[in-house]
Amino acid sequence: MKAFALIFAFAFTAQADPPDSFFRALHLVETSGKTGPILGDRGRALGPLQIHRGYHKDSGIAGDYSRCSDLAYSRRVVAAYLKHYAPIAWRNGDVHTLARIHNGGPNGASKRATLIYAAKVRLLSHRP
């Protein structure tokens, strides 16, 4: 029984959600660290993490889309979206895959167009 408990405990401690630096890096890449009701992508994205309406809806987070102007709320939306579409990458703290899905949607990890974006996020997430 002790062996099972140790294996069970190890399984949960071996997994790591993405570091806080992941969100800081997303914020820097998306809006250079600006906050507030920033419109981007020709008015189709809102806030410091540049969230689209469909992304917000897919996240399942309650609240009006306009709340995406708030950084803390936006982080909750991004976390819920990524946990839904990339649960393994989320549990493993796979910044590269998470950035690609944030940028390119549910299939973003397989889109070449997301590679440069993910490289920027990964680079910035490793800075102190």
Where are these predicted regions, by residue range?
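Sec-dependent N-terminal signal peptides
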Residues: 3-13
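Catalytic glycan-binding domains that act on GlcNAc-containing polysaccharides
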Residues: 16-128
